[in-house]
Amino acid sequence: MELRAIGRIGLAFLISCCSFLTSLAQVGEHREDFAVGFNGGYIMSSLEFVPEVPQKLHTGLTGGLTFRFTSEKYFKSVCAIVGEINYAKIGWKEDIQTPDDKPVINAVTGLPEEYERDLTYIQIPVFARMGWGRERKGVQVFVQAGPQMGILLSESTKMNFPWDQRTMSYTDGSGRTSGVMAQDTMAVEHKFDYGIAAGLGIEFSFPKVGHFMLEGRYYYGLGNIYGNSKRDFFARSNFTNIAVKLTYLFDIKRTRNPKIK
């Protein structure tokens, strides 16, 4: 089912992009610019579990390759398609507290209990991008949005207490606030992730040097890392994350038009 959903999202997006660019070609100023480069940044993620698991933001790094094809300028909007192939470390970090909002102290270690799951993905977003401002020299503001797919490469756990000696959630109100702990021993069941991403950023362009971009990006996962049928423990287990990224692009091909600024 996941692969079918991925296919539907990708096909719908490609059809929309082709229709969009075709319509622009009839009324817009033609461009045929192609740029490549690399990106890197900081990513903050969590998982929307149902039933709920109290969490803090999981933090990690992301980086990879970026490709951009600029096709048109429609009135004042510069239109492009952007693709990336990224390596990203995401996951979840549990907020283990008592009902009084105090850290849960493990009886064996004497330390506040901590649990974190690191998940390493290859992420492939494809964006429709619109920018306003200078293309060759100066500043441009842009927005972009589109589907994103992810492929799980590996997972690892960070835990500072013996699992069989963990603090439970007791009926008298002591121990953990949440008794939901099934996820701590469950490996990821669905290796493919998919969803929708959108970003807002600013670009600085310099002739013969390239393009530098700063972007804030939000991602909402439409898939679940665990099964969500009636017999499964979780009804939902999808990603949300926020990334702050820097990107550098250099031009491979540029449209010959002295009017382009």
Segments from the language model and where they lie:
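Short loop/turn motifs that connect adjacent beta-strands in outer-membrane beta-barrel proteins
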Residues: 26-33, 72-79, 133-140, 206-211, ...
